[in-house]
Structures are given as structure tokens and as C-alpha cells.
Curated annotation (Swiss-Prot):
PANTHER family: RNA POLYMERASE SIGMA FACTOR RPO, RNA POLYMERASE SIGMA FACTOR SIGD, CHLOROPLASTIC. Its main location: plastid. Gene3D superfamilies: 1.20.120.1810, Winged helix-like DNA-binding domain superfamily/Winged helix DNA-binding domain. Residues 377-396 bind DNA. This is RNA polymerase sigma factor sigD, chloroplastic. GO terms for cellular component: chloroplast. A motif (Polymerase core binding) lies at residues 207-220. It is found in: Plastid, Chloroplast. Disruption phenotype: Reduced transcription of the plastid ndhF gene. It comes from Arabidopsis thaliana (Mouse-ear cress).
Length: 419
């Protein structure tokens, strides 16, 4: 260790007994040997000389020309705090422990620090422009054919279509591949920082990062450096749009239209705002008033936002009954409804018994009481060989008789229960 001490002349080193070194970790002793002074432009300018030797070290220690330990402690504490702040990104992105070692290795490559867009890129303006130009040229060549692999005929056609030589076309395609890899690697932190804000919405973090990387490359192909913006500023919105579309299309078993997904997102956000404001769960009317929408639209959005439930889900505490055994299908009828229909059919038969056979027949055909399809007066007349007007008169007389029957009010019970 070399230490600088002020002196006016060249230091003279003399033999001395062995002394311990300044480092406590080194348990050896050194014999002080005469050594010439080491001069440098820095020492000459400041009238100092660089002297090495254990005796010089002792003199420096005795004269207290050392940096105080307190200062080193403060700087070390500051460095530790900065490392802890940077390590927060790793902790937030820590994936769930998997038993498969391959999954853990893949997750470790994704756990990168979450930083802002200003620190995510390591490319200069010139590099951004060059890489984006490679992407644009490669995209134009790729649009001329469906395959850009090692096919001589395809390479010739692509080159002739763009008015370029075969060699230059292959170079552009290779540069495009390299540019995609470099942009994806340099702006990965920006993609991760955006993707972490959309966790817990149906897709895991790895899928969100993958979709964000696709949006990053799409935005880079359409980047225009003449506008004066940085690439990170432009692709931010492409990354966000790609992630939102992926959540809308891939996060649910039953896909929702884009407009309905946007409406459900607005309703969910308004519900959270009103919950914090009112300190309770808001109603559909309050959400509709907050968003200036119809109550029916809000209720529809709430229904569509519910996650699907498996029919194999256990519905009882003992675990012996599932939802499939409880929920009825569209063609199934509950036992209570079957009993109600039988009672109502019996009441109607008693009412029709107070009429004549022709009147009962006309009412049955007109209203479809016996499970038949309702018919018009003209169709009933053709069936009974009567005129249309006569059938209408018979129907009116039969209804007038039924209104005067004492037990006609018993049917109102079934009518009110059906509502």
C-alpha cells in the first residue's frame, strides 16, 4: 500500500526491526528495506513524494493522515441502501417456487430489476436509428414472401422484388434478426416494468413479458426518429397496448368482445374508487351514475366480469356433492315446477268443465291449453267447419262465462308466482 505524505526532501529509509503490516489479515512481517522514493507528476506538482515501506506506514498512522473509519462506514451504509433499493425489483418479481428445476432456471432469467424507461435502454440515438432501419428493411423484404429461410429461389425473388442484390438482401435479413435480439435484450427492463403493473388479471408475469416484447418489436419497426422522440418513449405505448390486448383475448376461458372488456375494466375501476370513498361496496346504480352510463349496461358488465366456475367444484362440506348434481340444465325441470304445472292443469280442466264441448274446444285451440300450438280464428273455423266470425263469437261467450265462475281467482296464485 502506497501512502502520500508531505515532505520537503527525499525520504531516507533506514533499517529497522521487523514490524507488522497495516493489514490485520496478513499475519506476516516485513523487513523494512531501503527503497527509492517514487516520484510522479502529481507528487512533484504538490511537492510530495510517494514512499513505500512499513516504517512509512507507521509514521502515517502515528500522524493520523488516514481517512477516518466513520467516513468509510457512512459511505458503506449508503452503498448498502442503494443495493437494497435495487434489490426490491428482484423481490417483487420473485416467481413462485416450482419443483421443476427447468422452470426455476427460466424464472431466474426473468427476475430483473424494475426500473424506469429512462434507465432501461443502453442504446445511443444513432444505434436506435440503425437498428430500427434494419427492422424496417427486413420487414419490407419479408412481406414479399412467406418464407425467408435458406431457400435460394426465395432469396433471389426477394432481392429482385426490392431491386437489391441477393447478397445485400441476405445481409439485411441477418441484420434484422440481430437487431430484434439486441432491442429485446436492451429494453427488457422497460417491458418488465410495464408488465408488473398488470399482474393478477388472468395472465402470469412470463406471458405478460412475452406479449410486451412482441409489442416492443412492432413499435420498433414503426419508429420514426425524425420526430425527435426516443425509442423508449415511442414503444412504451406499443408495449402497453400489446399487454392489454393479450389480457382481453387470452385471460378468460370465454372470450369477451373488446368493447365489453373495456367496459368491465371501467366498471371495476369505478367500483374500487367508490369503495374507498364510501367505505362500502357500491351498488350498480351508484356505479352507473359515476360513469354516466345506463344501469343495465353496468349490470351486464358485472355479470360478464365473473369468472367461470367448474361443474366439478365441491358444493357440500362433506365433499360428496358437486355443482353438476345441483345445477339444472336448460332442458331439465325442477320437481316443484312439475308439481305446480300439474295443479294448474287440474284447475283449468275444472274451469273448462263448466263450458260446453264446443266452447271448451275453441278456447283450447285458441290458447293452446293442452300443449298444442295456438291457432287463429280462421284456422279454428276451418278445423271445426265454422266461419271465422262464428268462432270469434264462441270465444267471447266462453270467456264471459269463465269470468263469472267463483273459483277463477284460484289461478291468480300461479300467475303471481310465475312473475
Amino acid at each position: 500500500m502506497a501512502t502520500t505524505i508531505p515532505t520537503t526532501a527525499t525520504a531516507t529509509m533506514c533499517p529497522s526491526p521487523p514490524v507488522p503490516t497495516i493489514s490485520p489479515l496478513l499475519r506476516t512481517t516485513h523487513q523494512c528495506q531501503p527503497s527509492p522514493s517514487l516520484s510522479s507528476p502529481f507528487s512533484i506538482k504538490l511537492s510530495t513524494a510517494l514512499v513505500c515501506g512499513d516504517t512509512t506506514v507507521d509514521r502515517v498512522v502515528d500522524s493520523s493522515v488516514m481517512i477516518k473509519p466513520e467516513k468509510w462506514g457512512i459511505q458503506s451504509e449508503k452503498r448498502r441502501k442503494r443495493r437494497r433499493r435495487r434489490r426490491v425489483g428482484y423481490e417483487r418479481l420473485e416467481p413462485e417456487e416450482e419443483e421443476n428445476a427447468g422452470v426455476e432456471a427460466e424464472a431466474e432469467t426473468i427476475s430483473v430489476p424494475v426500473v424506469g424507461a429512462s434507465r432501461s435502454g443502453f442504446l445511443s440515438r444513432l444505434e436506435e436509428v440503425q437498428l430500427c432501419l434494419y427492422l424496417k428493411e427486413g420487414a419490407k423484404l419479408e412481406n414479399l414472401g412467406t418464407s425467408v429461410e435458406e431457400n435460394e429461389m426465395v432469396s433471389v425473388l426477394l432481392a429482385s422484388g426490392r431491386g437489391k442484390k441477393k447478397r445485400s438482401a441476405n445481409e439485411i435479413l441477418c441484420r434484422r434478426k440481430e437487431a430484434r435480439e439486441k432491442i429485446t435484450r436492451c429494453y427488457r427492463r422497460l417491458v418488465v416494468s410495464i408488465a408488473t403493473g398488470y399482474q393478477g388479471k388472468g395472465l402470469n408475469l412470463q406471458d405478460l413479458i412475452q406479449e410486451g416484447s412482441i409489442g416492443l418489436l412492432r413499435g420498433a419497426e414503426r419508429f420514426d426518429p425524425d420526430r425527435g422522440y426516443k425509442l423508449s418513449t415511442y414503444v412504451y405505448w406499443w408495449i402497453k397496448q400489446a399487454i392489454l390486448r393479450a389480457i382481453a383475448h387470452k385471460s378468460r376461458l370465454v372470450k369477451l368482445p373488446g368493447s365489453m372488456w373495456e367496459l368491465t375494466a371501467k366498471v371495476a375501476e369505478a367500483s374500487n374508487v367508490l369503495t374507498r370513498k364510501l367505505r362500502r361496496q357500491p351498488s350498480c346504480e351508484e356505479i352507473a351514475e359515476h360513469l354516466n352510463l345506463n344501469v343495465s349496461a353496468v349490470r351486464l358488465a358485472v355479470e360478464r366480469s365473473r369468472s367461470p366456475v367448474s361443474l366439478d367444484r365441491v358444493a357440500s362440506q362433506n365433499g360428496r356433492m358437486t355443482l353438476q348434481e345441483i345445477v339444472r340444465g336448460p332442458d331439465e325441470t325442477r320437481p316443484e315446477e312439475m308439481v305446480k304445472r300439474e295443479h294448474m292443469k287440474h284447475e283449468i280442466e275444472q274451469l273448462l268443465g263448466s263450458l260446453t264441448a264446443r266452447e271448451s274446444r275453441v278456447l283450447g285451440l285458441y290458447f293452446g291449453l293442452n300443449g298444442e300450438t295456438p291457432m287463429s280464428f280462421e284456422e279454428i273455423g276451418k278445423s271445426l267447419k265454422l266461419s271465422r266470425e262464428r268462432v270469434r263469437q264462441i270465444n267471447g261467450i266462453a270467456l264471459k262465462k269463465l269470468r263469472n265462475v267463483h273459483n277463477v281467482n284460484d289461478l291468480k296464485i300461479y300467475y303471481s308466482s310465475s312473475e
